[in-house]
């Protein structure tokens, strides 16, 4: 009887070990990807990413109907970007109709992410954190809600070439309702 108990325990343990092994094999690619995304960028690598925005751009934006936009609206504007402060920060000036905004982007070595501050001519400002995806040549920004209203936001910038950026902006309230949707195309001039 004791021998049978050991055999059953061994078989059960073996199945558990196999299940754990299969689970580990399935989880490794996810952990590996997370590790790669969390790797530190060198100062030169961060500089190379920041220079992708540098220069003068013309933009065409489509604001889709949402809570913050009563109807679909198309706008045009221009953007001028320059590296500042020993090439550690990117200063972006956005001119769109009567609105002007200044964005500051930098790479934070401590958090292994990019930081983005946006200051608008109406006095409002926003803060975003970003991760660079080298494979897709895209930057994904996540909105940080200091107001605690439960607003979430994402900006996905896809660098289609050295001369074109396609951007999608989505902001939602805590229930998931769309507050803002923007599709933007920027072309270097």
Give the positions of each predicted feature.
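Short beta-strand segments that buttress and anchor functional surface loops
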Residues: 91-96, 116-119, 140-146, 168-171
């Amino acid at each position: 009887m004791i021998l049978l108990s050991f055999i059953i325990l061994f078989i059960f343990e073996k199945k558990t070990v196999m299940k754990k092994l299969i689970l580990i094999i399935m989880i490794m690619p996810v952990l590996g990807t997370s590790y790669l995304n969390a790797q530190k960028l060198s100062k030169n690598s961060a500089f190379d990413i920041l220079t992708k925005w540098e220069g003068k751009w013309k933009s065409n934006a489509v604001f889709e109907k949402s809570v913050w936009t009563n109807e679909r609206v198309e706008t045009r504007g221009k953007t001028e970007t320059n590296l500042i402060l020993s090439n550690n920060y990117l200063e972006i000036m956005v001119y769109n109709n009567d609105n002007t905004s200044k964005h500051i982007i930098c790479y934070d070595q401590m958090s292994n992410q990019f930081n983005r501050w946006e200051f608008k001519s109406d006095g409002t400002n926003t803060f975003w954190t970003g991760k660079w995806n080298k494979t897709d040549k895209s930057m994904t920004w996540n909105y940080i809600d200091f107001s605690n209203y439960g607003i979430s936001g994402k900006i996905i910038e896809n660098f289609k070439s050295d001369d074109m950026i396609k951007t999608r902006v989505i902001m939602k309230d805590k229930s998931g309702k769309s507050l803002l949707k923007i599709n933007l195309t920027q072309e270097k001039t």
